[in-house]
Amino acid sequence: MAKWTINDSSKIYNIDNWGAELFSINKKGNVCVHPSPNSKYSIDLKVLVDDLIKRKIKPPILLRFMNILEGRIASISRVFKNAISDNNYPAKYQTFYPIKVNQQRQVVEAIANFGKKYNIGLEVGSKPELVAAISMSTGNNLPILCNGYKDTEFIETVLFATRVGYDITIVVEKLFELEKIVEVSKRTGIVPKLGIRVKLSSKGIGKWSTSGGDDAKFGLRISELIAAIEMLKQNDMLDSVKLLHFHVGSQITKIDKIKNALIEGTRIYAEMRKLGVNLEFLDIGGGLGVDYDGSKSSYFSSVNYSLEEYANDVIYQVKNICDDAGVPCPNIISESGRATVAHYSVLVTDVLNNNTQTLMPDFESILTESEKLSPTVKKLVDIYKSIDKHSLREDYHDTIQLIQESVSLFNLGYLNMAERANAEWICSKIIRKINSIVEKMKPIPDELQNFQLSLRQTYFANFSLFQSIPDSWAIDQLFPIVPIQRLDEKPDVLTSIADITCDSDGEITSFVGENGRTKALPLHKIKVDEQYYIGFFLIGAYQEILGDMHNLFGDTNAVHITFNKKTNYKIDTVITGDATWESLKYVQYDSQEILKRVRNNLEKDVSLQKVSIEESSHFLELLDKTLQSYTYLGE
């Protein structure tokens, strides 16, 4: 058999297809991160994590690669610039980052700084996001778009921000909202910059398809759009409308759905121009997807188009319809948050070593002394001895039947616990023996293709699924998971990944594989005393902000890293993860009050001689140390 290579590992984890040329495997068998596609510079993830641990930064660690963030902004801007040139498009393109995708200050700040030369803007949907965007725009002159529902306070804040020099556009979502805007504008004497969101009949596809279509949550129907135009005319505010916006959903997997929305949305733009609305911008919303599984398909974790194809279709469709309708082409805006930030962060954590010295039954003695076994267990031994490639199906089915029979006999009291344990042990041996034969078969019989799941072992990783990758639990989103080391060795254990929460839902059983979605993740058998790390990739969009504190596992340690040609990498920022006292504070516990209550109770016990002073003091020290410690597992 040929020696396992890093190319084999790249295939089974599909790195070349989902990695966007930002991730690779080096000759040491470690995962590397590149600042931009095809860059000759790289950071060895295993070396980086080892260095961070030497700095007392413990896993789980969220690694944020800021150069990738800059590169994604540049890539999106570049493909639109090329599409504009190729199609002789007479207007401009501008990207807006929807900060709901990842509101972390350092992330938004980096996007604001990187995006200056690309005239990037920020999109907000709430008062806290508005305030955050205003703070980031200060000194940077970043334009801001306001979507979502707005109350009077929100509208007043925007209008006075406009008065003092901020470039902010209010996007009207509902007719009653427009009435409020008109009222506040008249009362303050400040004319707003307005956009209108239209509700398209066209829909996206996948888990967010309801963002578009006639039943969408946001936007004006065509009849309401006509009414809005009339209201603006009556209040002499029609000239304040400069933008038309539509959005048909996040992570649109099929390019034809995007084309349909572009055609309908641009037709509405053209008709509004003919009605005398001097629109200057067409905001096509989000939807630009990320190929999480690398299949380049219309599956919900993938996309069947490239970044270049997306940009070309946007520019071509808008120009074609505007030329046909005889109206000026608009400046185009997109809100591609997911595609901007998904790739830039990686969560790395340790797998808890499952190597134990647990004594298992002496298999050889079971085989040689089978006459002492119960009839059910003896039948399993006979199957093990006689397995060959000609009887695989029958042997597999008989084994499953006998293991079920052993459970029934145990429940009825006819099989003791030792005999049931022997049945389980022999069953696992049979499955492994069958697997060793199946692996060599071409093709694998249909009935045996799924049986390998019975070999799947649960590997426990030091993280909270609900905190770090909640979409995996909530919507069955696929994220690439790869060991960051030993990729020059064949991974010989089929696994599922369980977190350390006390919840059965805290387990991942669907993974990115060589041929798309797979139900088991190949990992290595962990060596004694080995620190074995796995990385969760493409988690930069939504995961950090949607994460919750199940079991009070808090934010992880986070490290901002930039590439450095001299030292390979530079640590810009370290954000310490939540300590136990911080997680408790979220749910209204005060650490000092906890210590006070426990101390008072211990003093009573000391006075009654139930515990010694030394025991009381030692316990308080341990409790205080626990309050100051990371919420995740240590040694």
Curated annotation (Swiss-Prot):
The modification N6-(pyridoxal phosphate)lysine is found at residue 100. Gene3D superfamilies: 1.10.287.3440, 1.20.58.930, Alanine racemase, Lyase, Ornithine Decarboxylase, Chain A, domain 1. SUPFAM superfamilies: Alanine racemase C-terminal domain-like, PLP-binding barrel. One of its GO terms (biological process) is putrescine biosynthetic process from arginine. GO terms for molecular function: arginine decarboxylase activity; metal ion binding. It is an enzyme of class 4 (lyase). It catalyses: L-arginine + H(+) = agmatine + CO2. Its EC number is 4.1.1.19. Substrate binds at residues 282-292. Belongs to the Orn/Lys/Arg decarboxylase class-II family. SpeA subfamily. Catalyzes the biosynthesis of agmatine from arginine. This is Biosynthetic arginine decarboxylase. The lineage of its organism: Bacteria, Pseudomonadati, Thermodesulfobacteriota, Desulfuromonadia, Geobacterales.
